[in-house]
Amino acid sequence: MNRLKEKYVKEITPALVSKFEYKSVMQVPKIEKIVINMGVGDAVQNAKAIDTAVEELTFIAGQKPVVTRAKKSIAGFRLREGMPIGAKVTLRGERMYDFLDKLISVSLPRVRDFRGISKKSFDGRGNYTLGIKEQLIFPEIDYDKVTKVRGMDIVIVTTANTDEEARELLTQVGMPFQK
């Protein structure tokens, strides 16, 4: 069993039950999935950009991403419907816990001038979104092979009903929130 999953079962669940006074263990919020999305705006002019983004996301997530395509044509962006404009990957189960563990313990500390992540990025329904400005913070990415620095969005979807419950869950897991 993964280190984070074990911690969740043995330590976090009892702590959350006592703090929020749940009647059942099944009411305790848990992390459902993690979605990593990388928008590739320059894929409109450069078709190879989408391939490198897919390759980098595969290294980061350990799973092959899906290429996202434009829903509408936008003349101002020279964009046609159906053109590839990004890549996303959804992690669940064991891979999700592995990725979260790596994100918290290895990748986030590598961010320049890191003082913790914002407490304001909850959506009101217990989900947390984290924006990362460069893919170089992940140890799987080889610095010399990077052609362009790209950012990504990481969405942590939980079963929590309120932001307060989700914040407590993520704090217990070890997310480094700002003081």
Curated annotation (Swiss-Prot):
It comes from the Bacteria. InterPro entries: Ribosomal_uL5, Ribosomal_uL5_bac-type, Ribosomal_uL5_C, Ribosomal_uL5_CS, Ribosomal_uL5_dom_sf, Ribosomal_uL5_N. One of its GO terms (biological process) is translation. Keywords: Ribonucleoprotein, Ribosomal protein, RNA-binding, rRNA-binding, tRNA-binding. The keyword Endoplasmic reticulum does not apply. It holds the Pfam family Ribosomal_L5. GO terms for molecular function: rRNA binding; structural constituent of ribosome; tRNA binding. The keyword Glycoprotein does not apply. GO terms for cellular component: ribonucleoprotein complex; ribosome. Part of the 50S ribosomal subunit; part of the 5S rRNA/L5/L18/L25 subcomplex. Contacts the 5S rRNA and the P site tRNA. Forms a bridge to the 30S subunit in the 70S ribosome. This is one of the proteins that bind and probably mediate the attachment of the 5S RNA into the large ribosomal subunit, where it forms part of the central protuberance. In the 70S ribosome it contacts protein S13 of the 30S subunit (bridge B1b), connecting the 2 subunits; this bridge is implicated in subunit movement. Contacts the P site tRNA; the 5S rRNA and some of its associated proteins might help stabilize positioning of ribosome-bound tRNAs. Belongs to the universal ribosomal protein uL5 family. This is Large ribosomal subunit protein uL5. It comes from Bacillus pumilus (strain SAFR-032).
